Amino acid sequence: MAEYTLPDLDYDYGALEPHISGQINELHHSKHHATYVKGVNDAIAKLEEARANGDHAAIFLNEKNLAFHLGGHINHSIWWKNLSPNGGDKPTGELAAAIDDQFGSFDKFQAQFTAAANGLQGSGWAVLGYDSLGGRLLTFQLYDQQANVPLGIIPLLQVDMWEHAFYLQYKNVKADYVKAFWNVVNWDDVQNRFAAATSKTSGLIFG
């Protein structure tokens, strides 16, 4: 079975400046994200060993570790695609219509998502997701890398609120970081995720 690998970025580390510094992106990608990838592969190897030995305590421990590190790998893989040096502005098309319908307007959605990000206690993410069962857009505060978002939610847009994502540049002023984030949102990527989520899911079953 193939190992998980660190994805390449579609842009240089410094391409998102001045909104997100090249120093942050380099550390974030080559160190933090890479650590999650290693953690996934290590947890799987330890799970296989624990299963072979019938060690259920070790199985449960490494399943927990796997959830955390795989969550980190998935979240960051989406994060890099959600960003673009040509980003910003607002969504268009069906995604824009869905946001207007379900949040009242883009400005109201942006305010709600921003509040979710700034109000997060500790480490985690703000997430715009598509509820494949109810067929609606929802925002969530995702705790750590894997908690507080129900199964069946397909992530469309995420902002990383772990301190490693902003502290070197914005210190403890999270609000300035989140404000800057909107300038590099890759709405084409978010729209593509929305189109796939709405066309390839039915209830909790992928078509």
Curated annotation (Swiss-Prot):
Q: What class of enzyme is it?
A: oxidoreductase
Q: What is its EC number?
A: 1.15.1.1
Question: Catalysed reaction per UniProt?
Answer: 2 superoxide + 2 H(+) = H2O2 + O2
Task: Provide any one GO MF term from the record.
Answer: metal ion binding
Where does this protein hold Mn(2+)? H28, H76, D160, H164
Q: What is its main location?
A: secreted
Gene Ontology annotations for the cellular component aspect, listed alphabetically = extracellular region
The UniProt keywords, alphabetically, are: Manganese, Metal-binding, Oxidoreductase, Secreted
Q: Which SUPFAM superfamilies match?
A: Fe,Mn superoxide dismutase (SOD), C-terminal domain, Fe,Mn superoxide dismutase (SOD), N-terminal domain
- Carries keyword Magnesium? no
Q: Which compartments is it annotated to reside in?
A: Secreted
Instruction: State the needed cofactors, names only.
Output: Mn(2+)
The record ties this protein, via InterPro entries, to: Fe/Mn_Superoxide_Dismutase, Mn/Fe_SOD, Mn/Fe_SOD_BS, Mn/Fe_SOD_C, Mn/Fe_SOD_N, Mn/Fe_SOD_N_sf, SOD_C_sf
Q: How is the cofactor bound?
A: Binds 1 Mn(2+) ion per subunit.
Tell me any Pfam family this protein matches: Sod_Fe_N
Record function comment: Destroys superoxide anion radicals which are normally produced within the cells and which are toxic to biological systems.
Q: Which family does it belong to?
A: Belongs to the iron/manganese superoxide dismutase family.
Please describe the quaternary structure of this protein. Homotetramer.
Q: List the protein's name.
A: Superoxide dismutase [Mn]
**Origin organism of this chain?**
Mycolicibacterium smegmatis
